[in-house]
């Protein structure tokens, strides 16, 4: 049932099992020298711990990990868990809030996400690249501060504080990049 993949055939985006851990390949390089087996260096992300490491593999046969993406909608937070509703079966999926420290900054009621699962094990939540969030509080603009792109601090509805342009006011909706948490633009 499980598929085997050779280390030299790994590509970015592939998932595999190595030393009882689930990995996602971020980058890889293959070096082959005369009369030696090829050496594969992979920058990988551990899907259980989210840590990023470099693994050196030499001619190993690895088990491919099949990761399922389940469309879900954020429902509510309960103590130390975030509760999502599966978009197809309508069952509730609970995820430990400590697993989603960064992702929590972009999740509000009704947010649509993809939940990454390996079998029945919930690994993580995949967010869209950009989300629309409400500005909860924005500092007042400073007049004459226009030598370069003038920025000020703003607190979003999730509690995340980011730098925004001077013209953004409290109560506006803005688009934020979920990868780096930076302001992208106004939401229309």
From Swiss-Prot:
Annotated CDD domains: S1_EF-P_repeat_1 (cd04470), S1_EF-P_repeat_2 (cd05794)
Keywords: Cytoplasm, Elongation factor, Protein biosynthesis
Keyword Cytoplasm: yes
Cited InterPro entries: Elong-fact-P_C, NA-bd_OB-fold, Rib_uL2_dom2, Transl_elong_fac_P/YeiP, Transl_elong_KOW-like, Transl_elong_P/YeiP_cen, Transl_elong_P/YeiP_CS, Transl_elongation_fac_P
Pfam families noted in UniProt: EFP, EFP_N, Elong-fact-P_C
Family: Belongs to the elongation factor P family.
Name recorded for this polypeptide: Elongation factor P
Organism listed in the record: Malacoplasma penetrans (strain HF-2) (Mycoplasma penetrans)
């Amino acid at each position: 049932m499980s598929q085997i993949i050779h280390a030299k055939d790994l590509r970015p985006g592939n998932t595999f099992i190595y030393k009882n851990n689930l990995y996602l390949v971020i980058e890889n390089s293959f070096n082959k020298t005369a009369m030696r087996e090829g050496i594969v260096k992979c920058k990988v992300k551990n899907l259980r711990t989210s840590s990023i490491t470099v693994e050196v593999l030499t001619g190993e046969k690895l088990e491919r990990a099949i990761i399922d993406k389940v469309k879900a909608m954020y429902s509510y937070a309960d103590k130390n868990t975030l509760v999502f509703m599966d978009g197809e079966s309508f069952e509730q999926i609970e995820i430990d809030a400590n697993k989603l420290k960064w992702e929590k900054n972009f999740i509000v009621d009704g947010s649509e996400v993809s939940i990454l699962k390996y079998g029945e094990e919930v690994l993580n939540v995949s967010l869209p690249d950009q989300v629309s969030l409400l500005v909860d509080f924005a500092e007042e603009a400073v007049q004459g501060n226009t030598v370069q792109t003038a920025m000020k601090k703003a607190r979003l509805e999730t509690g995340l504080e980011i730098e925004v342009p001077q013209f953004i006011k409290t109560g506006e909706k803005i688009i934020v990049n979920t990868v780096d948490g930076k302001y992208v633009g106004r939401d229309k």
